[in-house]
Amino acid sequence: MADFDMVLKCWGPMEADYATHGGLVLTRLFTEHPETLKLFPKFAGIAHGDLAGDAGVSAHGATVLNKLGDLLKARGAHAALLKPLSSSHATKHKIPIINFKLIAEVIGKVMEEKAGLDAAGQTALRNVMAVIIADMEADYKELGFTE
């Protein structure tokens, strides 16, 4: 619980502008890990230099952060929120678990820059994301999805 609370203390600035921060998260993910762009076919035709200003990238980034905000606010009691997310990402989108670990690190960097998440907050976010990702991985296995 303490980890969730520590991350939530810095969540306000992220929540205040999901589109901008979400676009930044996805653009940075695609820049730092170019292989992840292949997992988003709807962004395939966008030139790398245009990703940051693309409305679709920002909108999807906003969705990612909005869902993460819901998971954070559940403070660990997130099974009902996570199951449908795990199901769609395993069966429809076919997103390997490693990619959630990659985006979690990017979210941590963006939160440090834009929301003042300090070193202790970074550790708390890693702990929180480890729990969420482990639960997703269990859902994936239950669904028979292995990368």
Curated annotation (Swiss-Prot):
Chain sites annotated for binding nitrite: H60
Q: Which GO terms describe its cellular component?
A: extracellular exosome; sarcoplasm
**Coiled-coil ranges per the record?**
none
Query: What Pfam family is a match, any one?
Result: Globin
What's the catalysed reaction? Fe(III)-heme b-[protein] + nitric oxide + H2O = Fe(II)-heme b-[protein] + nitrite + 2 H(+); H2O2 + AH2 = A + 2 H2O
Q: What is its EC number?
A: 1.7.-.-, 1.11.1.-
Q: SUPFAM superfamilies, alphabetically?
A: Globin-like
**Single GO BP term:** removal of superoxide radicals
Name the enzyme group at the top EC level.
oxidoreductase
Keyword annotations from UniProtKB, A to Z:
Cytoplasm, Heme, Iron, Metal-binding, Muscle protein, Oxidoreductase, Oxygen transport, Transport
Q: Decide whether keyword Transmembrane helix is in the record.
A: no
Q: What family does this belong to?
A: Belongs to the globin family.
Name the UniProt record assigns to this protein: Myoglobin
The major lineage groups are: Eukaryota, Metazoa, Chordata, Craniata, Vertebrata
Source gene?
Answer: mb
